[in-house]
């Protein structure tokens, strides 16, 4: 007897295993995931030599010691519409992860149903259409009532839901990194516009000084013409110069207005609440890049972190698509009361219990599962290729911005020498005027080359500040990858 039971158990096990194996759909085609760039590939070219420095710090703008800039950035971070949109994307990604996770949990619902029906005398339940109280039938009208609890659980043995939840969590982590990328773009954008405006203020001051010098020359030449001491050519030449300077002044004032309006839109200020921006000196520029990039660059660039999480999410989606080829199991159950007579609904004899284990075997699907897997794998490989190119672009940004900044530093050193040379010439002209060896007009006009070279120096300083902010942005702006968000 025992041997017969063991034989039956063994036979059932063999049949069950055979059913499970045969119930798996055939994966006709699935390629391996594309390779991601290795950390040792993330470095600058050997012929690029830049000054070494550390990574940018969080809230990097505070190191510039500019209260106006601090106030503008804080206002931007507290009221920016793009940042608010990014945070809403975080919430959406989180809710999607919660939704998928909830679908894999035990589902319990209370059920109440009242069904007033007339039983057909020619149907499957035709005996109940008779009016025979002795037999417990008082048809053809019945009022069936059902109350109870319904429960269902999907046994995720192969990880279909688990992988989908992991992909949603990856998308949420990507959204967190994207929010940091938006913050970085906003802060650097505000700083660049702010210092562009400061450079315009200083340029306007130099142009007004230039105009004062030329205006003195115009009046001096006009006086000489009036006294018949010289021809009108120098006078009209000076007039042409002052008109050219007036044109430059008008252009710079227009540029200040344009920059202010761009800044207004970026910080989210209205027509009447734009803060006044007072002129300040341009900050000192910190140059240099970290000694090595490698994996550290991936962790410090929020855009790369977002791409990395999207890659991971795509790989989880592939796992979920593969798991669909295996049999799926679920369990449904009902416990409650059911009666075709309302007066007997809550009696003990109306109790009902249903236990329904389910098995789904994907035998023939017309190629749907394979098409889904192939498309999901292709999307994942596309994301990997996009990530690899983003990493290469990030290294390029560091190299290009670092090289540009170093070139500007070299140009500034040479321009500073030119400024000093023209100042020497100006001092010599003033000394000659003090000794009575030259006229006041010549001594005054000797300042024009100095102002011109100072304008060139200012333009280089402005470009250096903007470029240093761009380099800092390409290094991540002090961002560090946040701890991984996992589902509890």
Curated annotation (Swiss-Prot):
PROSITE patterns: PROKAR_LIPOPROTEIN (PS51257)
UniProt entry tagged with the keyword Nucleus: no
Keywords assigned: Antibiotic resistance, Cell outer membrane, Lipoprotein, Membrane, Palmitate, Signal, Transmembrane, Transmembrane beta strand
InterPro entries referenced in this protein's UniProt entry, alphabetically: OMF, OMP_efflux, RND_efflux_OM_lipoprot_NodT
GO function terms (MF aspect): efflux transmembrane transporter activity
Location of the protein in the cell: Cell outer membrane
Membrane topology: Lipid-anchor
Protein name listed in UniProt: Multidrug resistance outer membrane protein MdtP
Gene name of this polypeptide: mdtP
């Amino acid at each position: 007897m025992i041997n017969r039971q063991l034989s039956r158990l063994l036979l059932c096990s063999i049949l069950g295993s055979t059913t499970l194996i045969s119930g798996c759909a055939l994966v006709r085609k699935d390629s391996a995931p594309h390779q991601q760039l290795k950390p040792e590939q993330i470095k600058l070219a050997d012929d690029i030599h830049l000054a070494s420095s550390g990574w940018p710090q969080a809230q990097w703008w505070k190191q510039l010691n500019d209260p106006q800039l601090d106030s503008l950035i804080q206002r931007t971070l507290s009221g920016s519409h793009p940042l608010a949109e990014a945070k809403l994307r975080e919430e959406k990604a989180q809710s999607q992860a919660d939704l998928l996770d909830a679908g894999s949990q035990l589902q319990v619902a209370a059920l109440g149903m009242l069904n007033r029906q007339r039983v057909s005398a020619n149907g499957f339940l035709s005996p109940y259409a008779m009016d025979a109280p002795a037999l417990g039938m008082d048809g053809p009208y019945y009022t069936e009532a059902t109350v109870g609890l319904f429960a269902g659980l999907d046994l995720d043995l192969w990880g279909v839901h688990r992988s989908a939840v992991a992909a949603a969590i990856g998308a949420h982590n990507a959204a967190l990194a994207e929010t940091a990328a938006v913050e970085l773009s906003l802060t650097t954008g505000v700083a660049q516009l702010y210092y562009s405006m400061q450079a315009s203020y200083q340029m306007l001051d130099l142009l007004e000084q230039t105009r004062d010098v030329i205006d003195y020359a115009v009046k001096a030449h006009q006086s000489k013409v009036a006294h018949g001491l010289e021809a009108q050519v120098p006078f009209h030449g000076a007039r042409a110069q002052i008109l050219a300077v007036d044109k430059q002044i008008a252009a710079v004032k227009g540029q200040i207005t344009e920059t202010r309006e761009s800044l207004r839109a970026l910080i989210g200020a209205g027509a009447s609440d734009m803060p006044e921006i007072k002129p300040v000196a341009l900050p000192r520029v910190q140059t240099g890049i970290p000694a090595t990039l490698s994996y550290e660059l991936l962790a410090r660039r929020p855009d790369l972190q977002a791409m990395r999480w999207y890659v991971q999410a795509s790989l989880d989606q592939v796992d979920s698509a593969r798991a669909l080829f295996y049999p799926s199991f679920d369990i449904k159950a009902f416990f409650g009361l059911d009666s075709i007579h309302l007066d007997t609904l809550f009696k003990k004899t109306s109790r009902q219990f249903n236990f329904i284990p389910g098995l789904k075997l994907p035998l023939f699907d017309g190629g749907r599962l394979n098409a889904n897997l192939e498309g999901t794998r292709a999307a994942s490989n596309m994301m990997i290729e996009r990530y690899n190119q983003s990493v290469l672009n990030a290294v390029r940004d560091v190299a290009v911005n670092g090289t540009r900044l170093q070139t500007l530093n070299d140009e500034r050193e040479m321009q500073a020498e030119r400024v000093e040379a023209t100042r020497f010439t100006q001092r010599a002209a003033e000394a000659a005027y003090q000794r009575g060896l030259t006229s006041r007009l010549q001594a005054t006009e000797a300042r024009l080359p100095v102002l011109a070279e100072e304008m060139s120096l200012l333009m280089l300083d402005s470009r250096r500040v903007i470029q240093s902010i761009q380099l800092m942005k390409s290094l991540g702006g002090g961002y560090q990858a946040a701890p991984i968000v996992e589902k509890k």
